[in-house]
Amino acid sequence: MPTLIHQRVRAAQAGTNPYVICRMPSGWAVLGDQQFISGYSLLLSDPIVPDLNHLEEKSRLQFLRDMTLIGDALLAVTDAFRINYEILGNDAPALHAHIFPRYMNEPERRRKYPVWTAYSKEERDSRPFELSKDKELMERIAHMIKQKL
């Protein structure tokens, strides 16, 4: 059953996905639909597989390396002090990783917990992706990633 991840990967392959930061060896680095935490990104596996365990070891390691390269880039171009990584796939069974920069200006009571539980849905939906606002950050992230590839 095709998921939003499938749709986004197809759009990235076609060059029509505005969220794309850059192509990586294991997939696509993209900015998240919601930017309530600036720099929230994802890595979408290409080719699409249901989960990490469906990849051969070499591809699995490449996906994890690419995921951390996105985190390294976020640390370099934002004021984040830490990166949270999540690979869930429960709602959309297609391999993708959520990459959340965490900032010291977040209230401590939120900073200590996963984003999904620390913020309400209304808060998470409060700042949608806007290419005109987010393009510069996407370019800086892409530049840092490409330096390490």
Regions found by a protein language model. Give the residues of each.
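HIT superfamily nucleotide-processing domains
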Residues: 1-149
